[in-house]
Design a protein with these regions (language model features):
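Canonical Rossmann dinucleotide-binding motif of NAD(H)/NADP(H)-dependent dehydrogenases/reductases
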Residues: 3-35
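Substrate-binding pocket helix/loop in short-chain dehydrogenase/reductase
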Residues: 100-104, 108-113, 215
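Alpha-helical segment proximal to the catalytic Tyr-Lys
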Residues: 132, 151, 177-178, 243
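Residue(s) in the substrate-gating loop at a strand-loop-helix junction
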Residues: 147
Length: 256
């Protein structure tokens, strides 16, 4: 069965590259009008140009810091101006904020805060922003990209990252319970290791050949996932095929 988002309005955060880019193009190519936001202006513009080459002309790029409530509110107001509501929210913005793993006694409060701000606060503010429009329309889809780190031990070794990703999963469960009576589903996808952005690429290189080999051996499918693998899972969960699925976290990790 084909998945269509004709007539739907979607917001994707962290849309400039990797998983966010794949999700943006996946939604747009299936008929959605997508408001793609990020703080990386050059990468965001490149993503839109790439979409134009494949007829994904319904992508509207916006520079938005998801930790800034005023900017999130303005984005939701603009995106919902036409139809009166936002149908789909996909929160991809997050990551390790340029950090690397270190002993807990060396972690600063600011480092801890930076990761929680973009991962957990950002997802909270975006969900908070779209909830009224979804309630008014009687339906909606909220999807948060978490991580396998939120379900187990982070390969990054970054305490705040593992904690923030676990926090996202807790937020998903709570919002699913709260928003379900309004016809709104809330789910998350927990990717395995994906070489989808500069941070994950640095991590891959730092593993060295032996570390890379061990990682691959622990994946039953014996390959790394691609951004499109994550996007495909998202397409299903935000579609009409998943109207009875909420509060769930889908691991997309090759069986690891």
């Amino acid at each position: 069965m084909d998945i269509s988002f004709d007539g739907k309005t979607a917001i994707v955060t962290g849309a400039a590259h990797g998983i966010g880019e794949a999700i943006t193009h996946g939604l747009a190519s299936r008929g959605a009008t997508v408001w793609a936001c990020d703080i990386l202006e050059d990468a965001l513009n490149r993503m839109v140009v790439a979409g134009s080459a494949t007829d994904d002309t319904s992508i509207h790029p916006r520079i938005v810091d998801v930790t800034n409530k005023a900017q999130v509110t303005a984005l939701v107001e603009e995106a919902s101006a036409g139809s009166g509501h936002v149908d789909i929210l996909v929160c991809v913005a997050g990551g390790v904020s340029g950090q690397a793993g270190q002993a807990i006694e060396n972690v600063t409060e600011q480092q801890w805060k930076d990761i929680f701000e973009v991962n957990l606060k950002g997802a909270f503010l975006c969900a908070q922003g779209v909830a009224p429009t979804m309630k008014a329309s009687g339906e909606g889809r909220i999807l948060i990209i978490s991580s396998g780190a939120g379900l187990g031990v982070s390969l990054t070794g970054i305490q705040a990252y593992a904690s923030a990703k676990a926090g996202q999963i807790g937020l998903v469960r709570q919002l699913a319970h709260e928003l379900g009576p309004y016809g709104i589903t809330v789910n998350s996808v927990a990717p395995g290791f994906i070489r989808s952005n500069p941070s994950s690429e640095k991590q891959w290189i730092a593993m060295g050949e032996e570390g890379q080999r061990r990682l691959m051996e622990n994946i039953p499918l014996r390959r790394l996932g691609a951004s499109e693998d994550i996007a495909n899972a998202v397409m299903f969960l935000v579609s009409d095929l998943a109207t009875y699925i909420t509060g769930q976290t889908l691991s997309v990790n090759g069986g690891r």
